[in-house]
Amino acid sequence: RIVVVDPGRGGKVVCACGVIAVAAGVAPGMALNSALALLPDARVLARDSRRERTLLETVAVMALDFTPRVNLEPPDGVLLEVRGSLRLFGGVRQLCARVGERLRARGLASRIALTPKRLASLWFARSDMEVVLRRPEALAGRLAALPLACTRWPERSLRSLATMDDWPSLVTRPA
């Protein structure tokens, strides 16, 4: 029944919500009044950026058990470079399962996405898509299914990219 609003946006827009709220039809970006119409007994909380950062740092420290290469992607992401850890943990699926188990044991929900490009992994996770893609050539086709908003790029950039048929190829080209 939890609905989180961003005080920086006047406290009138939902920025996150719990499972019960989602089941009732509440979604991030929705006006608070609309959310309350769907879930009148919602528990409305103000977003706390400091606590979010502390939680990300806690997750990052836990992730060091799996790899020494961990990066924070505030406000909601932690990226792990796991190529060197795969053999140690029995492969991709086993490693992802262990990371997920560790997070669940701490009461945290997660979306794990593993791709050859770190931003692509972040975008899949932000889009609620758990994927494991090891071949770079498979990436562009899968990226095309993602909403551009998952990139969190400026609105002007999103409008420009939306006019391009093959925007994923721009992201997946070798550097």
Q: What are the language-model segments listed below?
A:
Residues 67-71, 107, 111, 151-154, ...:
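Residue-level signal for secondary-structure boundary elements
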Residues 1-79, 84-86, 92-101, 110-118:
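Residues that scaffold, gate, or flank divalent-cation-dependent active/transport sites
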Residues 125-175:
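Compact, charge-rich alpha-helical regulatory domains located at protein termini
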Residues 91-146:
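Hydrophobic alpha-helical positions that pack around
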Residues 38, 62, 102, 106, ...:
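Generic, well-ordered alpha-helical scaffold segments in large soluble proteins
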Residues 30, 47, 90, 134-135, ...:
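Short coil/turn linker and secondary-structure boundary residues
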Residues 65, 88, 123, 157-160:
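Intrinsic disorder/low-structure terminal segments
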